[in-house]
């Protein structure tokens, strides 16, 4: 199983949107996919509940309580994890431990850029990332061609 953690310490950058879009796209390609919601708002779980029955299946996992982290079925191709906002400390370490890819959404704003840079610096302090066992990727969200940072 491959696991993608969608995370950023900055709120409002589209973590949930990116997570649910990734999960749906992977499921449409025929992969066995679960979407773990680690955000107390539970937006990913609500999105799964609202999907039409004919949509490609995505298995819901409720990781909002710390002890549930890591609880995933064995027969999955992909696990997509929707991280909470302000992820740090032990929670960040636990979620990164479950992941081999980390996607950090970034919106085109000076404030978001600064917060994301700080988040990426903190990720580098986590041993799994530092040793190259979890790759880190930044995804531009709500960006338009030719548009400068606000």
Regions found by a protein language model. Give the residues of each.
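P-loop NTP-binding core
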Residues: 1-150
